[in-house]
């Protein structure tokens, strides 16, 4: 279904009726039960169908991804599912497509899956997750994603700095130092990152995007999938340089290398990638600050203490990179 309407305004004012209209456009029928789920970037709802099944409908934030970029994600999920990876591919909406449009907003429906988020994993769970990631990367390396970005310093440092400094989010007295340390990190990591082969990866594989069910891990939420180094999908699961983090990475890699070789030299990118994520995520909040749901969710974002703590963390990373 394609209708007229200003997409951004429609996105902020989605109603249950419009959600149900979107689900039913291809012939599916709903009971009327529609539950909003916690999500910041997109609007996500759980909808009950007449047959008792439940689907999760994601309305993509206008301007975030193009139609082609979302279909790149859907294609990757379809390939992973065909290779029997534990992922949740999108449903055909009954129109012959996995991507719909209503009021100018693109949307996708997924079958609901059940699982738990585990904050701590035992060694065997880490090895099992590592095997799953290795299999995912083996599929991801088979081809590219022409409409998805590459993980690089332009996207993760330079463009975010324009948003943060140009929008006045970093306090005036701190802004020059914040810019300098971010650029220092960018300068240290640009060439090593560019020299590392990029392939299709999840991109945001933190513990909250891994559900654990009876059959093991299920990888969910590929919204940030992009072209990048495989190590990006590992460091978020075992952050830092503590003994515990090192053991976690060792377990993940033990499982990973059952299915695929891993370039261990790229582990040196873990801390630089963490720095890139810090700057990128702050710019993400800044870009969404006019969304009514963001200020209450991030109340410290406009406080000087938030930025000083972030600056000090970036300094620690930069000093370790460029002593």
Q: Across the structure, where does each feature detected by a protein language model lie?
A:
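Active-site acidic catalytic loop and adjacent metal/ATP-binding pocket
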Residues: 41-57, 90-91, 186-234
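Conserved NTP-binding catalytic cores of kinases and kinase-like/nucleotidyltransferase enzymes
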Residues: 1-92, 213-214, 321-323
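Activation segment
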Residues: 62, 115, 217, 225-227, ...
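ATP/Mg2+ or Mg2+-diphosphate-binding catalytic cores
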Residues: 4-7, 163, 168, 283-323
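A cross-family kinase active-site recognition segment
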Residues: 119-176, 196-198, 298
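All-alpha amphipathic helical-bundle segments outside canonical DNA-binding/catalytic cores
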Residues: 262-274
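Active-site activation/catalytic loop segments of kinase-like enzymes and analogous catalytic loops
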Residues: 230-261, 277-293
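ATP-binding pocket architecture of kinase catalytic cores
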Residues: 48-145
């Amino acid at each position: 279904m394609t209708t007229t309407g200003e997409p951004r305004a429609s996105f902020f004012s989605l109603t249950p009726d419009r959600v149900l209209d979107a689900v039913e456009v291809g012939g599916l029928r709903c009971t009327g039960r529609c539950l909003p789920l916690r999500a910041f970037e997109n609007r996500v709802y759980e909808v009950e169908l007449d047959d008792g099944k439940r689907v999760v409908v994601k309305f993509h934030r206008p301007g975030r991804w193009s139609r082609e970029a979302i279909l790149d994600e859907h294609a990757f999920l379809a390939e992973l599912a065909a290779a029997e990876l534990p992922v949740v591919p999108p449903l055909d909406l009954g129109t012959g497509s996995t991507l719909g449009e209503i009021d100018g907003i693109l949307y996708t429906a997924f079958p609901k899956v059940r699982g738990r988020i585990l904050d701590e994993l035992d060694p065997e769970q880490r090895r099992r997750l590592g095997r799953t990631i290795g299999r995912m990367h083996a599929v991801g390396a088979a081809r590219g994603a022409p409409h998805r970005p590459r993980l690089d310093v332009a996207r993760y440092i330079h463009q975010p700095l324009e948003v943060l400094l140009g929008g006045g989010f970093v306090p005036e007295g701190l802004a020059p130092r914040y810019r300098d340390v971010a650029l220092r990190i960018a300068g240290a990591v640009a060439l090593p990152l560019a020299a590392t082969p990029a392939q299709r990866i999840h991109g945001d594989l933190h513990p909250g995007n891994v559900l654990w069910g009876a059959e093991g891990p299920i990888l969910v939420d590929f919204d940030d999938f992009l072209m990048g180094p495989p190590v990006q999908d590992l460091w978020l699961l075992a952050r830092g340089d503590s003994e515990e983090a090192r053991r976690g990475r060792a377990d993940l890699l033990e499982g990973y290398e059952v299915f695929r070789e891993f370039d261990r030299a790229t582990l040196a990118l873990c801390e630089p990638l963490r720095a890139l994520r810090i700057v990128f995520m702050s710019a993400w909040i800044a870009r969404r600050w006019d969304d009514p749901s963001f200020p209450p969710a991030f109340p410290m974002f406009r406080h000087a203490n938030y930025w000083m703590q972030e600056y000090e963390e970036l300094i620690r990373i930069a000093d370790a990179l460029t002593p």
